[in-house]
From Swiss-Prot:
Pfam families xref list: tRNA_m1G_MT (PF01746)
Cell compartments where the protein resides: Cytoplasm
Protein name in UniProt: tRNA (guanine-N(1)-)-methyltransferase
UniProt catalytic activity: guanosine(37) in tRNA + S-adenosyl-L-methionine = N(1)-methylguanosine(37) in tRNA + S-adenosyl-L-homocysteine + H(+)
GO CC annotation terms, alphabetical: cytosol
Family assignment from sequence similarity: Belongs to the RNA methyltransferase TrmD family.
Binding positions for S-adenosyl-L-methionine per the UniProt entry: 114
Record SUPFAM superfamilies: alpha/beta knot
Entries under InterPro entries matching the protein: Alpha/beta_knot_MTases, tRNA_m1G_MeTrfase_C_sf, tRNA_m1G_MeTrfase_TrmD, tRNA_m1G_MTases_N, tRNA_MeTrfase_TRMD/TRM10
EC numbers on record: 2.1.1.228
Swiss-Prot/TrEMBL keywords: Cytoplasm, Methyltransferase, S-adenosyl-L-methionine, Transferase, tRNA processing
Amino acid sequence: MTFAATVLTLYPEMFPGPLGVSLAGRALREGAWAMDAVQIRDFAIDKHKTVDDTPAGGGAGMVLRVDVLAKAIDHAREAHPGCPVIAMTPRGKPLTQERVRQLADGPGVIVLCGRFEGFDERIFAGREVEEVSVGDIVLSGGECAALMLLDACIRLLPGVMGAASSGHEESFENGLLEYPHYTRPAEWEGRTIPEVLRSGDHAKIAAWRKSQSEIDTRLRRPDLWERHIGARVQSASGAQREVQDD
């Protein structure tokens, strides 16, 4: 099955952009995924191709019109039924690896890119649009965020990455940051590769990597660490209840 990536944007020339090279580009050429960049302006309702208007209540900037957005979304949904519609916006829920994996396991995704002051609020409930943020930052538009979302999905598609285990050992896949990596030379400016990684003892290497993941997560992302600990406690409690029920 080909993963269908549809982007609704005022700048379709930005796609596939960096997704046309490297692993994603090869996967695109091989048909693992397909790219359709749709010009929102094509769905304008006047001869001037107007897609925005002034904010109700006053204020700076312009807001993308709900009627234009709705027509663009309806067009994309008709072409790709079953694909969720995601709007890239700093007001959205933080994008997680778990959500990325859910999307990658599906038929595709329709990504709505904003510009100006953003979207008319009514589009989200009116067309069941999921709001997603890639970080606590504000970009000039949603296109760069859309590229991030699509790249995260594409690399998880079957056959895109070389090693089957690659996607499962990375940061966030098990709720932790990924362990540190090293390669030759063994010594550089007095800094050496940890001895355990040169030992050939796979059990010790696995234990070291797990320990480093936990240490780095605890120090660098205490929010992830607290979530990880909470999940472990919940899992242990559930297992204990099952034993007691038996």
